[in-house]
Amino acid sequence: MRFFSYLGLLLAGLASLASLAGLVSLANLQDFSTDNPLEEELRCWCQYVKNCRFCWACQDGFCKNKVLKNMPSVQEHSYPMEHCMLHRQCKYIRDGPIFQVECTMQTCDAIRLLNV
C-alpha cells in the first residue's frame, strides 16, 4: 500500500512539473507577436499567409506583396489608387472577407501626389 502512495506522490510531482512547463511555454507564446516578424521570417509568412498585413505595402497607389515580387499587385481586387494613398490602407476582397493592409505612404505625401 505504501508503494502506491509513493507512486501517487511521484506522479503528482511530475504532473506539477509538466503543468509548470506548460505555463512557461504559454508565457513565451504570449510574448510572440506576428505583427512585426523578423526579416528572415517574412518570406515564410508572406508565402503561406498572404493576407497578413505586414506582407503588403502601398506602391504607386497599388498594394504589392513585399516579398513575392512576381505576385500580381492587388489592384484588380482593391479600391482605386486614391483610396490606397489617402487612407493608407490596402483593401481587397477575396472570396468573402475584406482584408486591410496598412500602407507605408503618409497621407500628406499622397495628397501632394494627387494634386500634381
UniProtKB/Swiss-Prot annotation:
Residues 1-19 form the signal peptide. Disulfide bonds: none annotated. Keywords: Early protein, Signal. Induction: Expressed in the early phase of the viral replicative cycle. The keyword Transmembrane helix does not apply. InterPro entries: ASFV_fam_110 (IPR004848). The keyword Signal applies. Coiled coil: none annotated. Plays a role in virus cell tropism, and may be required for efficient virus replication in macrophages. Belongs to the asfivirus MGF 110 family. This is Protein MGF 110-2L. It comes from African swine fever virus (isolate Tick/Malawi/Lil 20-1/1983) (ASFV).
